[in-house]
């Protein structure tokens, strides 16, 4: 049985955790969207539609879970309405959004849903930031270990 490099094993475990965090975040986002769509079906009309969007993406080992506001421009009568996304920023150094910033783009009926969803996603963002830092640290440690091993081999050959 071949022994696996401990750094590779640690990195694999951390990457698996990032994948699990993304899957959990995606599940929360989808439940949020199901609740929004359900309410919108029961209450037709543009005035009842949500103007807040939630998305979850994974690229490499990074997870992006963010909110953006929606604004509509143009004439309904002329059928030239266009949607513009408005970036909602998190406070520096924070893993969660300020609820008043989100509520500024939300309808009254969706505020409790936003509060619940953001509490769950904030915890995932916090853990993901620590896991990605651990992945980077393991990569650096592996690089140092391999460079130390190669320098020892060179010294032994002399």
Label the model's feature ranges:
Residues 1-158:
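Conserved glycine(s) in the ABC-transporter nucleotide-binding domain "signature"
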């Amino acid at each position: 049985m071949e022994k696996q490099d401990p750094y590779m094993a640690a990195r694999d475990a951390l990457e698996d955790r990032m994948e699990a965090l993304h899957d959990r975040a995606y599940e929360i986002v989808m439940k949020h969207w199901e609740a929004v769509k359900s309410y919108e079906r029961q209450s037709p009309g543009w005035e009842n539609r949500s103007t807040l969007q939630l998305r979850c993406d994974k690229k490499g080992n990074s997870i992006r879970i963010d909110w953006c506001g929606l604004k509509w421009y143009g004439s309904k009568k002329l059928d030239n309405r266009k949607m513009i996304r408005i970036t909602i920023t998190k406070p520096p150094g924070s893993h969660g959004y300020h609820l008043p910033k989100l509520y500024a783009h939300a309808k009254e009926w969706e505020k409790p849903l936003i509060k619940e969803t953001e509490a769950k996603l904030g915890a995932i963002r916090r853990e993901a930031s620590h896991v990605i830092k651990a992945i980077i640290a393991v990569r650096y440690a592996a690089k140092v270990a391999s460079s130390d091993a190669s320098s020892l081999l060179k010294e032994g050959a002399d």
